Amino acid sequence: MCGVRRGMGVLLLFCAVALCAMPFVVRSVWGKVYIDIDSPAFQKIPIAVADFAPLNGNQGHADLSSWFPGAVRKTLDLTGYFNILNRTGGPRDQSQTGAVQAQAAYGEWRSLGAEYLIQGGFSSRGTQLVAEFRLIDIVQGRQLMGKQYTGGFEDRRDMVIRFVQEVLSLLTGGEGFFDTRIAFVVRQGRSSSLHTVGFGSQIDGRDLARVAGSPSLILSPRWSPDGRYLAFSSYRDGKPDIFVVSPSGSGLKKIVSFQGLNLPGAWSPDGRSLLLTLSKDGNEEIYVMDVRSGQVRRLTRNSAIDVSPVWSPDGRRIAFVSNISGSPQIYVMNADGGDVRRLTYSGNYNTTPAWSPRGGKIAYEGKVGSGYQIFSIDEDGGNVRQLTSGAGDHEFPSWSPDGRFLTFSLRSGGRSRINILNANTLEVRTLYESTDRCLGPAWSPRLKQALR
């Protein structure tokens, strides 16, 4: 069943939940049923979504009968965990009776291969919208979760996202990632702009936001661990300085402006330090800066070029790129700069390391033929795995907060894409596409204000 054994018991709990970040109230019934989405044997979870029915005979906004299930299907599909069954030819669901509480035809849904069913309904009064969602376990023939959301019509997308996050939490034990954004740079000729896009933007095509612009280059966006700031390098004043800005675009401030190259690496897990690549003392070396005081301390000392530093999740080690061996390779050192050791030996060009938030693995890009591909390697140097394939340049990997997905940029055929990769199944989806050059994607932490 889904390639793994499903939980045998279901503990039903009744609770009332108030959504602090949302203008509607939730009532829920939920149970613990975990499916191992990290198993090599994992198969997508077969799920069906029924048309939604008007509640209590409310016939207003009939288009929502198809809008809600369509949005639920798109949102489930974005996770990469579900096999959404085509409802064509499926059983006549509760929308034919007008009673959202009616029992689904479990046997008929099961004959279509469904293991779970989502059904629901809606009603409206003036500008207020009420939506119900229910998750049914078809195999066990019982309801696992029921939620009701109340808000404005502009909140219906957020209602769908919040419910799917609850489904993910219940079935997989994960938190989901719709409350995250991905920052990336768009180049148009000589000018550049920094943008963010919400992970759920494909649901209805919205949620792309411009953060900052420059008539020259912007490089290396980096999220602070609390999601309040983006650090990046820009040539807006004639040389590569480091700036910080809020994701809304306010509070732009220059924080590093040494002579020569200034590039941000990564914020420390506690947000107190920022790794840097500076050339103020000659060649490019790795430094760490105290964010409050602005004081910097040098970590590497050699004649090579050292760039792209990132922290381990516990803040005790740093991965970076150095050409000290003659070609760019990934190295690891202690947070104080000691105990440097080479990590990658396969390939003659490996760069842009990204340490998984779960620990254990580092993603990076490596040159293969005339293009670049994304790889992962265990933090001890073993188990090298190529994660992408195909023509073009696959670059700038960045992990999702749960460490199960990667975002990266792909340049191929005159188009640029910001893609999402499932690190287990290797399934790839496109989040954003343009004829302009898109690069340097950076995945945010979970954002408290994310459900917009």
From Swiss-Prot:
Entries under InterPro entries matching the protein: 6-blade_b-propeller_TolB-like, PD40, Tol-Pal_TolB, TolB_N
GO biological process: cell division; protein import
Organism domain of life: Bacteria
SS bonds (residue pairs): none
Subcellular location per the Swiss-Prot or TrEMBL entry: Periplasm
Primary localization: periplasm
Short name of one Pfam family: TolB_N
Signal peptide: 1-31
Annotated keywords: Cell cycle, Cell division, Periplasm, Signal
GO cellular component, one term: periplasmic space
Family to which the UniProt record says this protein belongs: Belongs to the TolB family.
Subunit structure: The Tol-Pal system is composed of five core proteins: the inner membrane proteins TolA, TolQ and TolR, the periplasmic protein TolB and the outer membrane protein Pal. They form a network linking the inner and outer membranes and the peptidoglycan layer.
Role summary: Part of the Tol-Pal system, which plays a role in outer membrane invagination during cell division and is important for maintaining outer membrane integrity.
Protein's name in the database: Tol-Pal system protein TolB
